[in-house]
Amino acid sequence: AVSLEMWDAVEEALLAFSKDENVRVVILSGAGGKSFVSGADISKFESERGSKDAVDHYNARIKIVYNIIENFAKPTIAMINGYCIGGGLNLAACTDFRIVSDKSQFAMPAAKLALGYPFDAVKRLINAIGPAEARMLMFTAKRIDAPTALRLGFVQDVVAEDQLESRVMEVAEMIAQNAPLTVAAMKYISTQAMKTQPDSDGLKKCDEMVAACFASDDYIEGRQAFMEKRKPNFTGK
């Protein structure tokens, strides 16, 4: 379960990763092998969410972290092994894609706890699996298994538990070997493309990021590597 202190730690780590040029992919996972995130720490509801002011503070705090993950400039992967419940489902939906073990389970139990589920979280779930399936999951508060999550499109790969880490690392390494500027541009542009009406500043930045790819040293390196039939050595410059 996640407490307010843990959300603070996640934000701190992500800010450090964003500044580290050696970090090209960020993998989010749960410790202990039993869950990704099994939801908020109910034992701390009284202290962290026991009053309107406390609820407002908690929601504002975690919204910041969700937005940081969702808009993180570098690719993010959720490595899920076990329970992915409530806030964990929302957290996973903030990442670019999700690779899970076959023992993983998913649920949004807000309706069983009389919790409000905010607009941003509902929108992420709808973006991931569509409105009808999102409503089914939210209204019933039922759990679904990994194959069902794959069928719905919430997760992109399901593997045996003992193969999960190696599979995630395989995908992360494939991404890390590609041109960082191009990957960053594709991530930003795909985020803009999902908006109902992208703003003019966002579209301008899309054009600028594409132009930066063609003006980069990596573009020269990519062409040379292709002609020389070798793997390119991209630097992100």
What role is predicted for each listed range?
Residues A1-S29, N67:
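Conserved CoA-thioester-binding segment of acyl-CoA-metabolizing enzymes
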Residues A9-V10, L28, D41, P75, ...:
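Terminal peptide-recognition signature
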Residues A13, H57, R61-F72:
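Catalytic-core regions built around general acid/base machinery
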Residues D20-E21, G33, A141-P147, D162, ...:
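C-terminal alpha-helix plus adjacent terminal tail
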Residues G33-V37, C84-G86, A107, S190:
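Short, active-site-adjacent cap segments at secondary-structure transitions
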Residues S38-K44, D201:
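Short, flexible, mixed-charge acidic loops at enzyme active sites
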Residues S47-A60:
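A short acidic, glycine-rich active-site loop
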Residues I68-L181, S216, E221, R230:
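Crotonase-fold acyl-CoA enzyme core
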